[in-house]
């Protein structure tokens, strides 16, 4: 009763809404790279490339209102973009953890290249997907690094990982960080804010 609507909506974010959010994040990042940040009034949002909101076939109308092009009270375009990026991240995380058994800490330690496709040697078709990362509870001998483990995941979870790879890519490059997911401050103008690193801890 509780999980069903969460998973349904998470799949909708991955398959229907994710492309719009990625386009918005990339537009923001491109604008950030060519703009001068002014501490008092922030960025000039009028020159941010416009991105569209797609119609959702399941809803029969656009899945959300148009993106802000200028601040509305205390609600800024940057804050709005960050919130939608976090919604996408939460949806992908729900799918990946529910369908694979990966723990939250293990998810935060995944790297960008964690996803691998296992192909049929004769046809070349993908027969299964797996994620490679570090376990959170496996005992490690003192002085030795933990050995990576594999989680076999279904295609839906693989699509979630691929969306996370795309959604955070521009920020990985900017912060020189290869983790699959960064924290919310990564979308800001600095790599650190209030002492929080870009990588989830």
Q: What residue ranges belong to the model's regions?
A:
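Extended, charge-enriched helical/coil interaction regions that scaffold DNA-processing
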Residues: 1-201
């Amino acid at each position: 009763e509780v999980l069903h609507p969460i998973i349904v909506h998470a799949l909708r974010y991955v398959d229907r809404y994710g492309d719009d959010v990625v386009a918005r994040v990339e537009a923001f990042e491109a604008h950030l790279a060519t703009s001068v940040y002014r501490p008092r009034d922030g960025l000039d949002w009028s020159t941010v490339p416009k991105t569209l909101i797609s119609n959702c076939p399941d809803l029969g109308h656009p899945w959300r209102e148009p993106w802000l092009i200028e601040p509305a009270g205390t609600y800024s375009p940057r804050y709005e973009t960050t919130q939608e990026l976090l919604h996408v991240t939460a949806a992908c995380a729900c799918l990946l953890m529910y369908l694979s058994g990966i723990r939250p800490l293990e998810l935060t330690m995944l790297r960008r290249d964690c996803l691998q496709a296992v192909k049929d040697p004769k046809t070349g078709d993908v027969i299964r997907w797996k994620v490679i990362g570090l376990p959170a509870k496996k005992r490690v001998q003192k002085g030795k690094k933990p050995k990576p483990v594999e989680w076999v995941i279904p295609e839906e979870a693989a699509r979630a990982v691929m969306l996370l790879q795309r959604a955070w890519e521009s920020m990985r490059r900017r912060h020189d960080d290869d983790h699959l997911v960064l924290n919310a401050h990564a979308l800001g103008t600095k790599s650190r804010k209030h002492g929080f690193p870009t990588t989830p801890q």
